[in-house]
């Protein structure tokens, strides 16, 4: 079984924020697979079972806040007895321009507290889909305010027309075992 875990914050006030872009991608993937999320308190997550590329997959959205994602990931891995090679994390990336998606199979947290939590609980050997959210607005607001601000209308449209399809294709590659660090995608133009 593969685990696809998206970082984000629980609560409707965060639903369309930059920090929840991973959740938005996972919600779209679940919808396309006909999967429904159910809260699993012992796993600290909402999970949904799906079949992708002919394989069983667990989609997971931690119900902890973004900066405590590692606790949920560890609980899920222990419960399902999966290795780090079976885990893909989808998250926003401040260092990449909006719409750029890059694959990484290990690495430091680069100041991302959610990744820091994951690395603390899991180590660094899991795959990551890093979805760029950077825009000039970041410089005026500061990082903390920027990641908690909703996507603009143009960004939300790009998410639906380009980022979600690209993310879905990369998830399918991960499940099929063909995802690698050169599977980088650039699907949108800056908005």
Residues covered by each model-derived region:
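Electrostatically charged, flexible surface regions
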Residues: 154
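Nucleotide and nucleotide-moiety/phosphate-recognizing core
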Residues: 2-106, 116-129, 136-142, 157-190
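Hydrophobic alpha-helical segments within soluble ligand-binding/sensing domains
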Residues: 111-114
